[in-house]
């Protein structure tokens, strides 16, 4: 009498939230690069990190960019950005809708609103 065991392996994606954290970290540490042409080639042959006197190539795991992102805080008709001035923000939020981040360090005015509505309460 013998026994047989079967093992099945598979790859799964990480939880969406974990993936978001990894991408956000990569975004915060992204490296600006510039294309470099070998002497005889017309097309760029590789990318190098864009720093004075730097000849380092980015690592395969680096998130890289060639041009800096536009400033979304200020209005820019060229990119179509309307900026953040005059938008409502959430004073207590820590993410993109929070006043500290959305107002780009310019400061903000606070307004307190009261709202009355019927709640169909029964006592």
Curated annotation (Swiss-Prot):
Gene3D superfamilies (UniProt xref): 3.30.2460.20
Region (Disordered linker): 33-61
Post-translational modification: Palmitoleoylation is required for efficient binding to frizzled receptors. Depalmitoleoylation leads to Wnt signaling pathway inhibition.
GO CC term (a single one): extracellular space
Lipid-modified sites (O-palmitoleoyl serine): 1
Keywords carried by this UniProt record: Developmental protein, Disulfide bond, Extracellular matrix, Glycoprotein, Lipoprotein, Secreted, Wnt signaling pathway
GO MF, any single term: frizzled binding
Subcellular location: Secreted, Extracellular space, Extracellular matrix; Secreted
Disulfide bridge map: 89-104
GO terms, biological process: animal organ development; canonical Wnt signaling pathway; cell fate commitment; neuron differentiation; positive regulation of JNK cascade
Residues carrying sugar: 90
Domain of life: Eukaryota
UniProt function note: Ligand for members of the frizzled family of seven transmembrane receptors that functions in the canonical Wnt/beta-catenin signaling pathway. Plays an important role in embryonic development, including dorsal versus ventral patterning during limb development, skeleton development and urogenital tract development. Required for central nervous system (CNS) angiogenesis and blood-brain barrier regulation.
Family statement drawn from the similarity comment of this UniProt entry: Belongs to the Wnt family.
Name this polypeptide is given: Protein Wnt-7a
UniProt organism field: Plethodon jordani (Red-cheeked salamander)
